[in-house]
A protein has these predicted regions:
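Active-site-adjacent alpha-helix of alpha/beta-hydrolase-fold enzymes
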Residues: 1-66
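Catalytic active-site module of serine/aspartate enzymes centered on a nucleophile-bearing elbow/loop
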Residues: 48-96
């Protein structure tokens, strides 16, 4: 499961954080990406911005089995640039 949020200024932030905690407690694989840019994130940026890249990487990974930088590799491990970027909050549980 994937949750992408627009940070504390996002109206959905508290619910998304709570959903992450509850789903993770069930042992269901889950990722959360959040950047403080508000509800809707940067989806209206050229080509959908980072939010669209994250969404597409998740779909590529789970629907196409893509483990490269256009799939799982963008979201976890050494290829995850969001994971080391201080502008992003990234959490994961039970991801393999």
């Amino acid at each position: 499961m994937l949750i992408v949020l627009g940070g504390p200024s996002d109206i959905a932030y508290e619910n998304g954080e709570r959903d992450y905690t509850n789903i993770a407690a069930l042992g269901i694989p889950i990722l959360l990406f959040s950047r403080d840019i508000g509800h809707g994130g940067d989806l209206f940026s050229s080509r959908g911005g980072d939010f669209a890249k994250i969404d597409l990487a998740w779909l590529n990974w789970h629907l196409k089995g893509d483990t490269t930088a256009t799939g799982k590799g963008l979201l976890v491990g050494s290829g995850c640039t969001y994971c080391t970027n201080s502008a992003w909050e990234v959490k994961s549980m039970s991801i393999q």
